[in-house]
Structure formats: C-alpha cells, structure tokens
Curated annotation (Swiss-Prot):
PROSITE patterns: ATPASE_ALPHA_BETA. It comes from Cucumis sativus. Its main location: plastid. This is ATP synthase subunit beta, chloroplastic. ATP binds at residues 172-179. It is an enzyme of class 7 (translocase). The keyword Chloroplast applies. It catalyses: ATP + H2O + 4 H(+)(in) = ADP + phosphate + 5 H(+)(out). The gene is atpB. Keywords: ATP synthesis, ATP-binding, CF(1), Chloroplast, Hydrogen ion transport, Ion transport, Membrane, Nucleotide-binding, Plastid, Thylakoid, Translocase, Transport. Belongs to the ATPase alpha/beta chains family. It is found in: Plastid, Chloroplast thylakoid membrane. Its EC number is 7.1.2.2. GO terms for molecular function: ATP binding; ATP hydrolysis activity; proton-transporting ATP synthase activity, rotational mechanism.
Amino acid sequence: MRINPTTSSPEVSTLEKNNLGRIAQIIGPVLDVAFPPGKMPNIYNALIVKGQDISGQEINVTCEVQQLLGNNRVRAVAMSATDGLTRGMEVVDTRAPLSVPVGGATLGRIFNVLGEPIDNLGPVDTRTTSPIHRSAPAFIQLDTKLSIFETGIKVVDLLAPYRRGGKIGLFGGAGVGKTVLIMELINNIAKAHGGVSVFGGVGERTREGNDLYMEMKESGVINEENFAESKVALVYGQMNEPPGARMRVGLTALTMAEYFRDVNEQDVLLFIDNIFRFVQAGSEVSALLGRMPSAVGYQPTLSTEMGSLQERITSTKEGSITSIQAVYVPADDLTDPAPATTFAHLDATTVLSRGLAAKGIYPAVDPLDSTSTMLQPRIVGEEHYETAQRVKQTLQRYKELQDIIAILGLDELSEEDRLTVARARKIERFLSQPFFVAEVFTGSPGKYVGLAETIRGFKLILSGELDGLPEQAFYLVGNIDEATAKATNLEMESNLKK
C-alpha cells in the first residue's frame, strides 16, 4: 500500500497537493519531518524517503511515525539504514500503516520487516496484505479449551508441558542451546502435527538465520521446488538492522501468523527468537525519541509494548497461535525487567541451565526451574501428574544431598538416600535426548518420544526395575527400550575388554 513519490518543484502548493514533507533533522535512525499545515500524518503511518545520495545511489527508506512534535513536525523511526539521507529531502506520507503480505504465498520465503522478500527468489505472488498494527481479539472471540501440545521432547512433555494456543518462554543465557531447541521444535511440529509455523528472527545473528534456513531446506520443512508445500514462513530483522526494524519485525511475523489463524482457520506456531531483542530495540528507540529511561535503563513503556505484542498471540474460535519465545536472560539474572515482564505473559517456562550444559546433558532444560500451568491432574491426568511429581521430588532430594556428597562422599549416606541418588542420576541422564537438528554434532539419529512412552520410561526408573543398569545407558537415548538395549551393549563391550 505504498504511494510512489511524484517529482515536484519545491513550491509549497505542490507539497500540499501531494502530501509531501521534508526532512528537517536526522539523529541516527530517527528522522524529524516537516509537513505543510493540515497535512500531518497519523501515528504509525508509513513514510517513504526516495532520492539519491551524493554518489548517485538510489535511496529508498521507509519510516514509521512515532511522535507528533508540534510546529507541523513529526518524529519517525527508520526501518532501514539512514546512510545518505540529507536535510530537505522529500518524504511521502502513504496515509496507511506498514502493511505486509499474508497467506499461503508467504510459506517457504524469507521476509524483512516491511514484508519484502530477501531470499533472492523473486517477488511474492500475493495481493493480500495486512497492516502490522491491530487490536487483540475481543473476549467473545477467545477460545478457553485446555489441551496439551505434544512436542516429542521428554523433559518438556513430562515436566513442563506446553499448552495448545499458549505462550511458552525459553529462558537461558548465551550458549546453552535455546536456538537448537527452537529448531528441534519446528522440525518436530512440522513432521508430527503438519502445522504451519512462522519464525520471527528478532535481533539475532544473521549466521544463525542462514543456518536455520539451510537446515529447513534439508529437512523438507521448506520445499524450494513447490513453496506451497513448505511449512514455515521466515521473517528476519537481525542484529545488523536499525532498532526500528528490530522493534517491528515481531509484529510482522505475528501479522502473518494471525492471517493463518483467522482466515485459514489453522493452528499456527509462532517462534520468536529472541523476545529480549524486541525489548532491547524498544529501549534504543525510546532513548532516541527522548523518553526518560526507567528501571535498569529500560523504556518506561516496557509493559505496554510487551502487552500489545503478547495479547495478540492467543487462541480464538477460528484457530490458535501457540507461541514459543526464546528469552535471553542478561547475566543469567531472572529479575532483570526484560525477562521479568515476559514471565507475566507465559503459560509455561522452559529454563535452560548452564550447569546441565556443562555436564553435557542436552537439551539442558532445568527440570526443577521449568514450570507449566498445564501440569495439573485434571488436565494431564493422574498418571502423568504423579510421575512428574515423583521425578521432581527425586531430583530435588538429589540436589539437597549434593553438598553432603561433596564433603563426605556417597558412602556416608543412608541406604535409602544412596538409592535416591542412583535413580536421580539415571533420571537426569534419561532427560537428555538426541535431536534431529543436532545429528551432525552428536552423530546420533534424532528421536521423537511420544508422551505415553515418556511416562512409561520414568515410571520404570522410579519403580526400581532398572536399578541394575549403568547410568550411562540412559544418556542420549529416546525411549526406555533403547536404554535397556544400550545397557546390554555396554555390558557386552566390557566383557570383551576383559
């Protein structure tokens, strides 16, 4: 919905006729634009700056109006680099907010914040566009059914199950495996549920975005021969983009997901990697707009910005959006305002632990810190609930005994505590799992473990039936039958060595 600027003389009458303004000031990615009296654009309108820089290169920068300053001026945030812009350049008011393509034609393609394809595979064949700013669905449209979303990952399905149509946070510091877990979830959901996913890469590494794209092509999640058979649309606003693009790219991805939910009536998965970068970009924009910073230097509008994004992610009577959001935790501090504000919106949290990653237990999901509102007997059933609680109790007891073991050694424990420690160590290892997307690193084929199989495995460990097996037999296996088979192989190998 863009209006190309017409060439015009600098006369005021022509400017008024074409709804054109001129750049009055440039502060990095923020532009002040002067418009003729009575021709002021609305907040969130898209403005387009077209022209040539000093070297003759074409410039095409889209901005979004953020503030009306008075004196016929507006302050706008650029969605791409402002290099080459000069004061006095013409700016066109499109009279509409940013709009992006939506629908089946977006599948298998990579877009930027403006909805322009950036994968060099030609234009997107769609005439359907949707504005990125919308209200959340009304109460009457919401669906309140509670059901579990099976992921095929043991530690998640057993201890912190995801809600269909819910919001899930992946918490963890740098380098503990958030992005690998997200890639595995996209892979499992496309294969096991046949669902459509939208991936929003918000302020993360371009290399990771490229790796994810290649991985998806290899695994068949994206079909280059026939895009209609692809299962995912990708929207990237990576680390090298200006803060305006990083702040709005989450809304672009969400708008595409909403169309699949509301018009196609599908169940959609929305991945946001990383929601912290959305907050960080908002903080940068807030400072550039001259707002007073709030706690720890964050923007004063942090809760409002987060709420306007999160409240649109929900289940309606037409379909659902289940959202999985990676949350970078600065300095591993969960009380930082960015992760703390995110917590308020989540139905489940998957917390990744550096301690488990150091032990080599992947996925490094902390079984005691991860939570879910779904883990209730009336939702998951008595058997699942009881097994999950007993697993947590065993691991908690092991955690309490670790100081005693470190000082006095295992031999000083009672018989009962020694048994608890042995079972807890088996459980800890059985919570690890080989991933499909990590096959190249681990050399082990990936495993999808159904919920019933997961519960059966942990019940067998807790019952004591497998006390005789070595704990390494439970490391990086799928279901419990693979663990017993691995134990037999280990025994044969040790006999051969003798």
